[in-house]
Amino acid sequence: MASPSRPGNDCSHVIDHSHVPEFEVATWIKITLILLFLVIFVVGILGNSVTIRVTQVLQKKGYLQKEVTDHMVSLACSDILVFLIGMPVEFYSIIWNPLTTPSYTVSCKLHSFLFETCSYATLLHVLTLSFERYIAICHPFRYKAMSGPCQVKLLIGFVWVTSTLVALPLLFAMGVEYPLVDVPSHRGLSCNRSRNHHSEHPETSNMSVCTNLSSRWTVFQSSIFGAFIIYLVVLVSVAFMCWSMMQALQRSKQGTLAAKGQQLQLRKSESEESRSARRQTIIFLRLIVVTLAICWMPNQIRRMMAAAKPKQDWTKAYFKAYMILLPFSDTFFYLSSVVNPLLYNVSSQQFRSVFAQVLRCRLTLPHANQDKRLRAQAASTMDSARSVHRPLIFLASRSNSSARRTDKVFLSTSQSESEAKPQSKPQLLNHESPESDSVMKPANPATENGIQEHEV
């Protein structure tokens, strides 16, 4: 077994304050990152704000259920809070002066706690939205018993309470400290470290930053590892629910194709519309899963690197990899909050249309009931036009068929009445008389035409 001090008894391979100038980022890279983050900030705030307005309009017009609207609004709010809390600190502390930024303990703790809370609120909102759609599609009867404003408030409350509990340990684990302070009761590298003013008197060091406290190392590790497990559980759960919903829609489609008759055909068209809306929701959720997996994974890897071993044991290669990963992980993490409005627009043409209308401050979306009435009137007009242009011989055959069917219906009615009431007076109405035609004629001509066309 090789000696741990083989690379050098002076710990030259281990990171030290003297190595800080080697990892300073060039000014042009800092300016580029600030401009990139500024674009992400503006697009994220604008996109999520417009998303809140669009969902409210769609609900008011009858195109979106209130349960889904509440989930989407809460998700957009958590994304906005991520930008408002994280970006200002990102601009100055992490990008411009990542290694020498002074900070206050209270602001460090509050920023870490609030940022973690809003980040995991976004993650858990995806879970609750997927769960709500999963129950609605795979267990519709249970959904009717569970759905309602009270249940939605409970789910949203669960999201924020759980995310608060996930972030709570950071209130105790984070603080302002010289990052290379020895962790108590931790067996580090067995080599001779150079002692300096920063390590011997960290409380007066001018290189103190907002980092995990050495005295709370176990709390910090538990918090990061626990949050990573929650991240994996959410990804697996949402992926499983999306797969189950796709299977349920596939079974529903096969059952509908086996239906016959006009009444069942009507149900088929109605369920096709609902399946289309549900399919759009599933597409959105699948895109969300892919986005979370891609955009959150670099940030999770960086966090795991920070919690894997204390900074006092970081080598120069380890620290260099961490600093290279830092801007990429932060960029992808904020993109995950920007991409939600884009996914809404990709997965729903109606959302895309209303989104553009809100940006132009010109809403022209009709109510859902009005749209259905217009389609029904257009269909009725087309049916009437087709019936006017039919050949006379076809119309005559329809009339004869209608007369024969009317006789059959009338005779069966007379027979049933005579059997039920033998003492009553027999029917005196002639089947071929005009009165008979007037009695048996339906009140709605469109309905009569529809029945005759179907049976002919």
Swiss-Prot record:
Glycans are attached at residues 192, 206, 212. Residues 1-34, 90-109, 173-217, 306-323 are extracellular. GO terms for biological process: G protein-coupled receptor signaling pathway. The keyword Cell membrane applies. Zn(2+) binds at residues 17, 19. Residues 406-456 are annotated as: Disordered. Its main location: membrane. The modification Phosphoserine is found at residue 397. Keywords: Cell membrane, Disulfide bond, G-protein coupled receptor, Glycoprotein, Membrane, Metal-binding, Phosphoprotein, Receptor, Transducer, Transmembrane, Transmembrane helix, Zinc. It is a multi-pass membrane protein. The chain crosses the membrane at residues 35-55, 70-89, 110-131, 152-172, 218-242, 284-305, 324-344. GO terms for molecular function: G protein-coupled receptor activity; metal ion binding. Residues 56-69, 132-151, 243-283, 345-456 are cytoplasmic. Coiled coil: none annotated. GO terms for cellular component: plasma membrane. Disulfide bonds join 11-191, 108-210. Belongs to the G-protein coupled receptor 1 family. Interacts with HTR1A. Interacts with GALR1. This is G-protein coupled receptor 39. The gene is GPR39.
